[in-house]
Amino acid sequence: MKKSVAIVFGGQSSEHEVSLQSARNVINAIDRESYALTLIGVDKLGRWLRFDEADYLLNANDPARIKLSGSGKQLSLLPGSVGGQFVEVESGKPLAAIDVVFPLIHGAFGEDGALQGLLRMLAVPFVGADVLASAACMDKDVTKRLLRDAGIAVAPFMVLNRGESLSFAQAAAQLSLPMFVKPANQGSSVGVSKVSDEAGFAAALALGFEFDHKLLIEQGIVGREVECAVLGNDEAQVSVCGEVVANDEFYAYDTKYLNGDQARIAIPAELPADLSDQVRDVALQAYKVLGCAGLSRVDFFVTEAREIIINEVNTLPGFTSISMYPKLWQATGLSYAELIHRLIVLALERADEARLLKRDIFA
């Protein structure tokens, strides 16, 4: 019997359009012999809408103009309703029971623990990390503190909260130039600036605070940008390493999703075998330290001196046509459809384990 999978996509973050691209690819690749799909789009106002597959997207082939169609039927969510957690508002009818949710909402409200907490309240199994790991990995400040305390190398950094003051001279006294200013809770390089002088610093702070109340100010690292994909729960596996060679100054949003020809992807990365193994080992260490489950992409800088420095850990990496996570697994021998299947199985296994835990001390 087919499992019922709800693909949840869109959302209210600045990565809404990226999410739509990810959803389109997963929907096209999933094994229809094994899974029956329910498509749930979340619009930029936060409304949950059920879509038919025939007309859920407009401008689907244009990453800059892709958007949800106007055909969705609004849903309400009912925690505690066994098998009927999703109800169409207009008809009052519940959707067919959902066995597992595959969340593809990137950024705020999607991979920061908010959606994961909601799905936990709805008692629906879901693909990917749980609440704590999602929240910790979304906040670059928290991620780096946890990794640093575990003895895993990260770039030197400072944190600036809205309302606090920090001059360029103060930052430059602690961090070598160039510096990168990043919103602490954004992904896909949204709001990120490379800074080499005082004027650029002021502009970078202004831009960053448009997207977050907390900024990470990080020392630039001269090194190769290497990424690994991790898959699994307690016994996770790591893919081959890949490398991003950007023609721009850094791997910005436009380069990632709009102008893909501005970067070259090398899979596998052209690293010595022993160094590649070390990178993969550190990826697995970070995955465990942060409590990840299901999947994550771990991004590194690897210097000429063979230093391995973690840049970030993404618990819900992109599944677009140019995204590294599925490409890394394809190069490791796992097809797109099989990867999706493995992720769903991992989600169901984790849910089965959770059901074994006692929640009532008097039962």
UniProtKB/Swiss-Prot annotation:
Mg(2+) 2 binds at E312, N314. One of its GO terms (molecular function) is D-alanine-D-alanine ligase activity. Its cofactor is Mg(2+); Mn(2+). It comes from the Bacteria. Keywords: ATP-binding, Cell shape, Cell wall biogenesis/degradation, Cytoplasm, Ligase, Magnesium, Manganese, Metal-binding, Nucleotide-binding, Peptidoglycan synthesis. Its EC number is 6.3.2.4. Mg(2+) 1 binds at D299, E312. Its main location: cytoplasm. Pathway: Cell wall biogenesis; peptidoglycan biosynthesis. One of its GO terms (biological process) is cell wall organization. It is found in: Cytoplasm. ATP binds at residues 172-227. InterPro entries: ATP-grasp, ATP_grasp_subdomain_1, D-Ala_lig_Van_CS, D_ala_D_ala, Dala_Dala_lig_C, Dala_Dala_lig_N, PreATP-grasp_dom_sf. Cell wall formation. PANTHER family: D-ALANINE--D-ALANINE LIGASE, D-ALANINE--D-ALANINE LIGASE A. Belongs to the D-alanine--D-alanine ligase family. This is D-alanine--D-alanine ligase A. It comes from Pseudomonas syringae pv. tomato (strain ATCC BAA-871 / DC3000). The lineage of its organism: Bacteria, Pseudomonadati, Pseudomonadota, Gammaproteobacteria, Pseudomonadales.
